[in-house]
Amino acid sequence: MPYSDPDKQSEYQRKWMQREGRSKPAIGTKRFFYSSCSKLKAKARDNNIEFNLDSKYLQDIFPKDNRCPALEFTFKRGDGKRIDESPTLDRIVPNKGYVKGNVQWVSGLANQIMSSATPDQVVQVGEYFKQVVEKKNAA
């Protein structure tokens, strides 16, 4: 039964998968890369974004140490929802699409940070935040 509320839909799907004895593919497995590729291809098609990836390429570029290269923590799966540590595919130059050479695996949190600002803005906010924390700790 489809729901218009994404949270209700996600909960319904999670319960169905548990009831049916199915689970999300483990990070780093062939099924994980195939599933990721399939979802990205559908997203690209629906949003008219260029796409030329395959599951083998996604596996080849996945960090061998299973860690986010930007924030350096180990990738993890959420229980039915994406979490900050979930592996996500980032388009380095968004308007180039999901094409070989323009994507990288990073955590959901790193992807959110990078998609919302320019590199200079990310550094500026980071420096400001660091100053705020240092002042608070000194007080």
Show the residue positions of the predicted features.
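Short linker/helix segments within small regulatory modules
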Residues: 58, 83-88, 92-102
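Low-complexity, polar-biased intrinsically disordered regions enriched in Pro/Ser/Thr/Gly
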Residues: 77-83
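Contiguous alpha-helical segments
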Residues: 1-69, 73, 77, 99, ...
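Phosphate/NTP-binding elements of NTP-utilizing enzymes
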Residues: 110
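Zinc-coordinating Cys/His ligand positions in small cysteine/histidine-rich zinc-finger domains
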Residues: 106-107
